[in-house]
């Protein structure tokens, strides 16, 4: 019989162990046994909580996505200026939060994206995450741009966020937050030029 209250602790241990294993050997080579050993639990615990490796990857991605949402939320709440430009910059900064650009997170995101092409449950999670980003960006651009322009600007900014992140991840280099913020700020400024919020 499992100890009462241990489930959240065990789940977090396994998520942390998954991030570490993916960072070291990649998702493909990270075995259930390696992850369990890193977490200091038996293989059966992974099956108990997550069913299989895909379930563990899904839980790990939900964890990263939760941190992403929290990073964006905190930046939006901290704003004193609620202009579309400031809110867009806060959304961008949340996407480039340390929780999303450390080596383990970046490698896990890459593994997730690759797996989501073949796993329907992971694909649904990716679609929800992608739509959320697009919707948030579109809502801010729509405050000052006509709907069609706002949609296009949101698609462009989402592509820029993902592209900057992906290029850094594939290079294996440390993510240059300052450069990414500067490039996305230039894009936002260009898209909003000549427009003021009502």
From Swiss-Prot:
Keywords of the record: DNA-binding, Repressor, Transcription, Transcription regulation
Domain HTH tetR-type residues, every copy: 8-68
PROSITE patterns according to UniProt: HTH_TETR_1, HTH_TETR_2
Record SUPFAM superfamilies: Homeodomain-like, Tetracyclin repressor-like, C-terminal domain
InterPro entries assigned: BetI_C, DNA-bd_HTH_TetR-type_CS, Homeodomain-like_sf, HTH-type_TetR-like_transc_reg, HTH_TetR, Tet_transcr_reg_TetR-rel_C_sf, Tscrpt_rep_BetI
Alphabetical GO biological process terms: glycine betaine biosynthetic process from choline; negative regulation of DNA-templated transcription
DNA-binding region: 31-50
N-terminal signal peptide: none
Molecular function per GO: DNA-binding transcription factor activity; transcription cis-regulatory region binding
Gene3D superfamilies membership: Tetracycline Repressor, domain 2 (1.10.357.10)
One Pfam short name: TetR_N
Pathway assigned to this chain's UniProt record: Amine and polyamine biosynthesis; betaine biosynthesis via choline pathway [regulation]
Function: Repressor involved in the biosynthesis of the osmoprotectant glycine betaine. It represses transcription of the choline transporter BetT and the genes of BetAB involved in the synthesis of glycine betaine.
Protein name per Swiss-Prot or TrEMBL: HTH-type transcriptional regulator BetI
Provenance organism: Serratia proteamaculans (strain 568)
